From Swiss-Prot:
One of its GO terms (cellular component) is plasma membrane-derived thylakoid membrane. The gene is psbO. This is Photosystem II extrinsic protein O. Gene3D superfamilies: photosynthetic oxygen evolving center domain (3.30.2050.10), Photosystem II, cytochrome c-550 precursor (2.40.160.30). Belongs to the PsbO family. Disulfide bonds: none annotated.
Amino acid sequence: MRYRALIVAFLAVCLGLLTACSDAPASSTRDILTYEQIRGTGLANKCPQLTETSRGSIPLDSSKSYVLKELCLEPTNFFVKEEPANKRQTAEFVAGKLLTRYTSTIDQVSGDLKFNDDSSLTFVEKDGLDFQAITVQLPGGERVPFLFTIKNLVAQTQPGLSSLNTSTDFEGTFKVPSYRGAAFLDPKGRGVVSGYDNAVALPAQADDEDLTRTNVKRAEILNGKISLQIAKVDSSSGEIAGTFESEQPSDTDLGADEPKEVKIRGIFYARVE
C-alpha cells in the first residue's frame, strides 16, 4: 500500500509538470477554445493572425455595401514624447514598458465600409471593445497612463481602389475620451460632477488663478490619428491583417496636467463582409 501511494503521488507530479510546461494553444487557431485553454496563457490579449503566404486580394464592387468586422488591434510597442533637458535639443519619443500586460488589446470592433466618388473607401467605426486603459513606464521610472482607443474612427484609403490588397492603407482620426470619468474623485475629493470645488490648505487661496486648473476638473475629449497598413489578405475568407501606428494624447488628470504625446505600434486583424 505504501508503494501504491508513492506511485500515485509520482504520477500526479508528472502530470502537473506536463500541464505546466505544455505550449499554449496558438493564437492563430480559429477553433473555439475553452476557458481552461485560455486561462493564464495571455491568448485573450492576442489578435488572430494570417499565414505568411496570404498575399491575395479581395475584389470590391462599388454597387455593393461592405462591413468591416472583428477588427482587432494588438499593441506591441509604446513610445512617449519626452521634452529634453537641453532646450537646444528637440523632443524625442522614448520607448516605454507596458505595465498592464494582459489588458491592452482592442477587439471585436465593427463598422461600415463606404465607397466614395473617387473610388476610395471610408471606414466608420460603430461598435466594439474600442478602448483599453493602459499604463507604460519610462526608463526614468515615470508612469504614463492613457486610454488606448479608436472611438468614432473615420479612416480613408487612397483613391482608385478596385480591391483590398497589400498596397491598401487606411488613415484617419478618432476621439480620445478622458482617462477618468466625470464622477471620479481625486485624492482630495475633487471631481467634475461631484466632490469639492476646491481643496487647498489655505481656504483663502481657493480662488487663486495658479490653482484653478487643479481645482476645476474637466473630462475633455481630445483627438488622435491612426494608420493601418494591410500586409496579408485571405481572399477566400475575407480576412485582412497588417500593422498599425497610432498617435494620441495621454491622461491629463481631468485637465490638471498637459497631455503627453503617445505613439503606439502593433498588429491588426479584421474581416470584410
